[in-house]
Curated annotation (Swiss-Prot):
Transmembrane segments: none annotated. This is Peptidyl-prolyl cis-trans isomerase FKBP4. Residues 1-22, 423-459 are annotated as: Disordered. Keywords: Acetylation, Chaperone, Cytoplasm, Cytoskeleton, Isomerase, Methylation, Microtubule, Mitochondrion, Nucleus, Phosphoprotein, Repeat, Rotamase, TPR repeat. Its EC number is 5.2.1.8. It is an enzyme of class 5 (isomerase). TPR repeats lie at residues 270-303, 319-352, 354-386. It catalyses: [protein]-peptidylproline (omega=180) = [protein]-peptidylproline (omega=0). It is found in: Cytoplasm, Cytosol; Mitochondrion; Nucleus; Cytoplasm, Cytoskeleton.
Amino acid sequence: MTAEETKAAESGAQSAPLRLEGVDISPKQDEGVLKVIKREGTGTETPMIGDRVFVHYTGWLLDGTKFDSSLDRKDRFSFDLGKGEVIKAWDIAVATMKVGEVCHITCKPEYAYGLAGSPPKIPPNATLVFEVELFEFKGEDLTEEEDGGIIRRIRTRGEGYAKPNEGALVEVALEGYFKDQVFDRRELRFEVGEGESMDLPCGLEKAIQRMEKGEHSIVYLKPRYAFGSAGKEKFQIPPNAELKYEIHLKSFEKAKESWEMSSEEKLEQSTIVKERGTVYFKEGKYKQAVLQYKKIVSWLEYESSFSDEDAEKAQALRLASHLNLAMCHLKLQAFSAAIENCNKALELDSNNEKGLFRRGEAHLAVNDFDLARADFQKVLQLYPSNKAAKAQLVVCQQRIRKQLEKEKKLYANMFERLAEEETKAKATVAAGDQPADAEMRDEPKNDVAGGQPQVEAEA
C-alpha cells in the first residue's frame, strides 16, 4: 500500500460528528474560517496571490460524511490562489500555509457554498471541514510562450480591473536585485514602451502592463527578458544574468486606444511619435524605435475618414514608418520582418528606392541571391546613380558565381563517384564474379585500343 493509498484510507475514516476548533484566520475575525495545523511545513515562504498551488485535500460535512477527496482520485489538485477559482475559505487558508504543511480548515457557509450548497453532496447552508496538504507553489508566468521568463508574485493586490496599456503614463517605485544585492532603487514616471530609455528591462514593462493600480509585486526575469547577453554596465550586471524586481504601481493614466482617437488626433500623434522613433534610432535603441513606428501603422493603416490632404500626409507617414521599421529590423537581424515591411512600403510606392534596396539587403542576408539581385537591378534601372546598389549587385554576382561553382563541384564529385562504381561493377562482371543464376549471353567486345565501352566513353 502506497503512502497516498494509506492516507486516502485514513481520510475516509471520519464518521463521528466533527468539532468546530482552530485559530480564526478570517479577514473579518468572524470565525468564518478556522485553522488547525496538523503538521508543520518547512521554510518561511507562503503562497502569494496569483501563485499556482498544488494540494491534496479531503472534505467532510460536520456530521463526518466525506463528500470529496483528491486522494481517492490519486491526483493532486491545483488552482491559482486568490483568483476566485475555489471557495473563499481556501483562498484565505492556503495563503497561510508552508510547503509540506497539513492543516484542518473549518468553513462557515458564507466562506464555502452558502445558502445554495453544491448538490447533491453538499446541502444548503453547510459548514465544511477540509484537511489540506500543500505540496508546492509557483508564481504566475506572464510570457506568451509560457517559457518561465517573466514570473510574477503578488504581495499586495491592486484595486479595480484596469491595467496600463502601451503608451500609458505610469508612476512606479521599484527595487532591482541581482543575487540578492540591490542594484537599482528609484521612483519613476514614464510611458509604457519607453522603459529602455529609463534603463528598465523589457520584461519589467510587460509585467507592469499586467498590474492593477496600487499593486505591489515581485517579478523574476530570465536573461532574455532582462538585460540579455549584453548585460548592463551602468548597474554592473553581467551578461545573461537573472534579475528580481520589487515594484509598486502607484498610479497610471491609460493611453487612448486607436478607436478612441479622431483622425486628426491620429495624424498629430503619428507625427510626434515618428520624431521620437527617429531619436531612438539615432541612439541605436532599435527595439524602442520599432515600438514607435508600429504605433503609427496601427493608427493609420485602416483609418478611412481623412480628408484628401490628410490622406496624403497619412500615406507618407505610413510609408516612412514601414521603411524605418525595415531598417530597424535589418539592424536587429530580423530579416523576415524587414522583408515584410519593405513589401508593405512597396505596396504604397512600388518604385520606392529605399524599399527596393532594403528588401535586397534582407534577401542577401538570408542567401536569397536571385531575389536580392532582382531588387538591386531594379534600383539601378530606376536610379542609375545609386552607388550602394551597384556595390551590392557586385556582391550578389560574386555570391551567385561562388554558389554555382560549389554546386558544379558537388555534382562533378557525384558523377565521378557514380562512374567509379560503374567501372568497378563492370570489372567484377568481366572477372567472372557473377551470381550463380546470372543469365549467360554473348556481350559485344570492346575495342582494345579504346579501352572503354562506347557508351561509357560518351558519358
